[in-house]
Every structure is written in C-alpha cells, then in structure tokens.
Amino acid sequence: MRTAVVVALLGLGAFAVAAGLVLQLHTYPLLAKLQHNINTTSVSEGEGVTAVVYPPGGVPEIRHGLRVTATTHVEGDLAAPEIKKNGDVTVWKRATIVKEESAKLVLSAEVRRICLDRRTAEAVAPCHGEFYETERGKRITAEGRQLLQPGLNFLFPFDTEQRDYRWYDTVLKKPVDIHFDGEQLLQGLDVYRFVHTVPPTALERLEVPGSLIGRPESSVDVTRYYRVTRTLLVEPTTGAVLSVREDIRQELRTATQGEGEGTAVFNGELRLTNASVTANADEVKKNLPKLFMITTLPVALWVLGAVLVAIGLVLLFLHRRGLVAGALALVAGVCLAGTITYGVTNASSPDSSLDLKNVVSSTNVDYGLR
C-alpha cells in the first residue's frame, strides 16, 4: 500500500505543478483581456460650479453656483477591422456630454474612438478610424501609424503596479504622469489611489466678447489656461477605474493678467456618483473570482505540488506509521486536483459568446446622447 500512496503523491504533486503552469501560461492570456463588447454609462456630478453657458440665441455668459453633470457612454465598435476573436486589440468609443442641470444647457461635449491593447489597456497604432471630436463637425483623425491618443485612456493594465503611469488628458491632448498615492478600501475592495496635478497650462489663444470677461470692448484677445487635480481609485487585479474625482479650473487671461487673475470659465469639482461607483465595483466583484484562479492559484499549486512530492519522497524511507499522514495528504491532493481540473476546463475566453458575423457599425455614438 505504501508504494501506491507514494506513487499517487508523486503523481499528484507533478499534476499540481503542471496545472499551475497551465493556469499561468494558457488560462491567464485567455481571460485577462479587455472585452470587445463593452457597453457602459457613468455619471459624474458637481455642485457650486462656475461655468460659461451658451443660452439659445444669446451671448455666452458666466454663471455661478451651478449643478453640473457629465454623462459618459463607452461602447465597443464591433464592426472595426481590428476586432478579432481572441485578438490582442480592441476598439472602444466614448461619448461625453457635460450639462448644467437647471436649464439643461450643454457646456461641452466630446466623442473619441481609439484602439487599445487588451492586456496593457494602452492605446495602440495603427488604428483605422481613430479620432477625437470636441466640436461638432471638427473631427481630428489619426493618419497612418500616428498614435493620436497615447497612454492609458480608460483603464489601467491587469495587475496594476504601485508606480507611475501615463494617463491621457483629453484637454491637453497628451499623456501626463499619474502617481501612485497609496491604498484604501472602497466598497469592500482593496484599491490603489493614483493622483496627479496639471499646473496652470496655456491651451490656446481666443477672441471673446468683452462682456464675457467684464471688459467694455466688443472683443478681447485672451489665452485659455487649464489646471486639474485628478484622483483615480483603481482595482489592481483588473485595472478597473472605480472612482474618479477631478478638481478643474479653466480661465481666460489677458496679456496683463497672471495666475488666478483671469476670468474662470469653469471652476469646480466633478466626481463619479455613488451609483456609478457601485456599478463599477459590482462588475469587478463579478470578475475577480475568475482572475483569482489565474493569478493567486498558480503559486498555491506550485507550493502544493512541492509539498506532495516531498511527502511522497519521505514515505519512501518511513515505515507504516507514515502511511496515515500520506493517506490524508493524498485525499487532500485529490480534492484540490479535482477542483483545479474543473476550473481549468471551464475557463472561457471573454470572446466565447461574441458574434462578429452580423455586426452593424456603431458610428452613431453622438455626444453621450443615448
């Protein structure tokens, strides 16, 4: 009997090590990918905001104490040529509209389309049809292998690290460093906090009505400046951004004005609503068990395999009193091996239910109006 137990322990030990390798080398690349068919909506809100508004038929004016909402819709462009089952690139489009709630006036809007590496979440090129548009009819498109919106745009990579990343700022139109700032708990999830501050930065020169900045002239030359402090809470295993807070100031300065002396055309804080944060957290909680199997479990399997092999070797040199411990280890090994086998065989790609044969182009995403 001892010989049978020894052989079984050695076999299970080898199986556990092999299963760990399968999870790490096969199942991880299969599951740890951004989905093609994303379709989400989130809302950010701000109270007491100062902003320039554009009344219908009137002239732009500065209003204070506004309640502002920013609605963002993200969906996958399944008709894009880059989309392939189990491929490494996906294509997402994002539409955002910012409104002042009392009069339902639109303050700003944008539409973006971008190709993403499904593992790192970074923008990639070439990307057929990549663009951004912040004014209707004035679309900026990528040419050739140009990377129009580099860096991270929507998410962080799987297994996010405690280090700096490059986050694309849609106002600056370029990526900026965002810094790891600590850990905290959010709705039962351990998250990483990333923060950066963009100092007041000149964006463009404009000619605006003098009345907008309290001047008697019919028009005045000004420069628009932008500053933001952005805080993102990221679930590190999935790279999902669960919460966003942005303290934003944009002001118009004349040639003689310094920092803080200009006219604020947007000043306030926008943060993701509790409902949106909860929806993000619930989605992560649904996916974490799958990813646990392919991140933590391989290490446990390697350790278990080594222990089982060690027990088997020890039993080769022990008498019958070692058989009880060996039998218990064997039973534990069989149970765990069965669990692992079930998990590996039932792991499915996020593309397994995706139908790419009858998709219709979704180019109608329009300024978040869904």
Model-derived segments and their meaning:
Residues 7-10, 14, 145, 182, ...:
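N-terminal hydrophobic or amphipathic segments with adjacent small-residue motifs
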Residues 2-134, 341-350:
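Solvent-exposed N-terminal domain segments of exported/luminal and surface proteins
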Residues 214-315:
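Membrane-proximal extracellular "stem/stalk" segments
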Residues 278-279, 350-370:
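N-terminal low-complexity, Pro/Thr-rich disordered segments
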Residues 127-142, 190-196, 201, 260:
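N-terminal short leaders/motifs
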Residues 153-255:
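Membrane-proximal low-complexity regions enriched in glycine and acidic/polar residues
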Residues 2-8, 290-347:
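Juxtamembrane interface at the cytosolic side of transmembrane helices
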Residues 122-177:
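A surface/extracellular/periplasmic glyco- and lipid-processing/surface-interacting theme
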